[in-house]
């Protein structure tokens, strides 16, 4: 009986992984050489493609077609000492888009999908991206509901009709629709997109903390439901493996425990006027130093200077 139970525990994620959608994500041509550890790109998209009309109404997502980047996070897992790292990339970051001049980084995804987004960030960071994972609105909400809600501490009252939420300050359990609004809202946060990126990393960590609890893992029904909900709205790179996804999941889990550093790429200006409109400019010197440390395997035990989202300019 024990062998059968353990077999089921292993079979559930393996079976779920076999149903996940795959997409081309690896650029061709010159790419950065592989550095220390493993680096992944985690993208939250505003795709409504897997939502029914009833779900779109419940989640307050509207019905815009296509997929745009709503969240961009570089995940780095070192091979040796030091903590794993999540680095939020503001979607309004003004960067060179290979073959398309300078633009906001989310334009790379709109123009050339995952391949061009990966290429853009590889050139901007000097890190070779080893895997790609993308989740849409529906997948995110379903995972939270499959877990029976996720506990989070809301730092201020959040009333945002555009994100379909009305939350009071304080610790509480959020449902799928509430969680989606919590990570989407940018107009209620005095820090704008930077504060929103912090909430996204915070909530991803809370999801993985809940998913790893014995009540989830040791309950066959809950474990099956959670693993399959997790991949229902997931899109991965063609060469991204289950092991890669496991590394990302463990890194996210470490946010709540402090084992993972939760950072923002160093910034110079969060409201710069560019040809693309109001944009975010990186602090190139500080960002370059951060990415060089990751590439070389220099251990990170605490957040480097300039990674708190406060502009240096």
Residue ranges and their predicted role:
Residues 2-313:
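Non-catalytic, solvent-exposed segments at the cell envelope interface
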